[in-house]
Amino acid sequence: MLVLIKHPLIEIKLTEMRAAETSHKVFRSNLDEIASLMVYEVMRNYQTKPKKVITPIGVETIGKSFDREVVIIPILRAGLGMMQGILAMVPEARVGHIGIYRDEKTFQPIDYFFKIPDVPKDSYIMVVDPMLATGVSANDAINKLVNLGFSNIKLICLVGVQKGIDLIQKNHPNVDIYLASQDEKLNENNYIIPGLGDAGDRIFGTKAK
């Protein structure tokens, strides 16, 4: 299932991120805030269980907690830009990391790091990456998780295009995809159009715009 999360705050912050003159400081801050706004919708159907607490005046009451582990898995490196925004909403979440970069000539994924928490296979897994372009990196990351036995996986991206969406939906029809914007297309270098440039470079300020 594809879910487009529409909200004026998200749309305004995304517009600022698209602008070439936006500093990496503002870009990073906006991405962090959009991730917080998106995860509210992503977690809407997560199940809870009763949790007993004692209030400051000594009264016992029953509230709620998630019924299983929540795990955030950013695809390095750009996915790190969404991690803190989600952790702000779910501070108890575990964090894993999957390192994948795209070969600039073949556009194929190159794996270089994989480490995730030791959690039950029915845990709530959120794979995060700002860009869903060809979908190859996200597909590779999801493949690794599925091969380990995880099934409750959601993919959260800021912007994406149909090509990447189609690849994930074809290979992983049970993985829900959440986007803030579905953009028009990819250019000859597989950059999203209109997009927002290279998300990793703009998050970390590693290349002049």
From Swiss-Prot:
- Does the record bear Transcription in its keywords? no
Q: In which pathway does it act?
A: Pyrimidine metabolism; UMP biosynthesis via salvage pathway; UMP from uracil: step 1/1
Q: Where along this sequence does the record place binding of uracil?
A: I192, G197, D198, A199
* Organism in which the protein naturally occurs: Metamycoplasma arthritidis (strain 158L3-1) (Mycoplasma arthritidis)
- Catalysed reaction(s)? UMP + diphosphate = 5-phospho-alpha-D-ribose 1-diphosphate + uracil
Protein residues bound to 5-phospho-alpha-D-ribose 1-diphosphate: R77, R102, D129, P130, M131, L132, A133, T134, G135, V136, S137, D198
Per its UniProt record, the required cofactor names are: Mg(2+)
The similarity comment for this entry is: Belongs to the UPRTase family.
Asked if the Swiss-Prot or TrEMBL record annotates the protein with the keyword Glycosyltransferase, the reply is: yes
Which intervals of the chain form a coiled coil?
Answer: none
GO biological process per UniProt: UMP salvage; uracil salvage
Q: Which UniProt keywords apply?
A: Allosteric enzyme, Glycosyltransferase, GTP-binding, Magnesium, Nucleotide-binding, Transferase
Cofactor binding description = Binds 1 Mg(2+) ion per subunit. The magnesium is bound as Mg-PRPP.
EC numbers, comma separated: 2.4.2.9
Q: Which Gene3D superfamilies match?
A: 3.40.50.2020
Alphabetically, the GO molecular function entries are: GTP binding; magnesium ion binding; uracil phosphoribosyltransferase activity
SUPFAM superfamilies associated with the record: PRTase-like
Q: What Pfam families has UniProt attached to this entry?
A: UPRTase (PF14681)
Q: What is this protein called?
A: Uracil phosphoribosyltransferase
Function field: Catalyzes the conversion of uracil and 5-phospho-alpha-D-ribose 1-diphosphate (PRPP) to UMP and diphosphate.
